Amino acid sequence: MNTDTSSPETAPSGVLLVHGAWHTGTAWDGVAAGLRARGIPVAVAELHRGSLAGDIAAAEAALDELAGSGPAIACGHSYGGAVITGLPAGRIAHLVYLAAMMPDIGETSMGLLAGAPPSDLRACIVGDFTGITTIDPERAGPLFHAQLDADSRAEHVTKLVPQVMAPGYEATTTAAWHARPSSYVLCTDDRAVHPDLQRRFGTRATHTITWNSDHGAFASHEADTVELLARLAAPAG
């Protein structure tokens, strides 16, 4: 755990948003709009590159879209946490893990899930766990968005896409949270990533924040997510 809690003397270059498995960058539409309305530059990574290394490279390329030259706030949701963990620490001002994987060097996302108390995730996955999978559309809403109304839940489910499982079995080779401050957002109503596993990750973070949220906190707690990221993106002073 990095214990540096100081804020940057100048504003970070912006906020990088990294989606989770079975999702795309559209998951962040509301959060991105909220940040941009406050004048905060935003870059949204698009993953699904077939490997953890490829997804990390895609996220780093998204960092290049930010106009500022300084380090950025990187926020990863779910599997996206493994991606931001692998980013070069020198390009990151603060890491935010939103109900996310927070692996250490040598750990894999699938290994961490297998070693945790069972959630509803495995029963909702359709397909070959070593190949390409989807989420059962009848179960996806309650799994990811239990706190949304039926219409909003259905809208988010239509955005889900197939997921290559290989990145989940790839070991983390570098962990930026050892070198940069981090915040872990623990979602206590999460049915996909068990809250007990999230508590374990919270012990690795500089700060732990607890929300009574489902897995898709970017939607059910959109305003809270915007507020957290905007605060971190503001310069000290």
Predicted segments with their positions:
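Conserved HGGG/HGGXW glycine-rich cap/lid loop of the alpha/beta-hydrolase fold
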Residues: 10-52, 70
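Conserved acidic catalytic loop of the alpha/beta-hydrolase fold
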Residues: 48, 54-71
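Gly/Ala-rich beta-loop-alpha elbow adjacent to hydrolase catalytic centers
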Residues: 75-80, 84
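Flexible "cap/lid" loop of the alpha/beta hydrolase fold
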Residues: 91-137, 164-168, 193-194, 200
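Active-site nucleophile elbow and catalytic-triad environment of alpha/beta-hydrolase enzymes
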Residues: 155-176
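Catalytic His-Asp charge-relay segment
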Residues: 179-186
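Conserved loop-alpha-helix segment in the C-terminal half of the alpha/beta-hydrolase fold
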Residues: 187-212, 216-219, 231-232
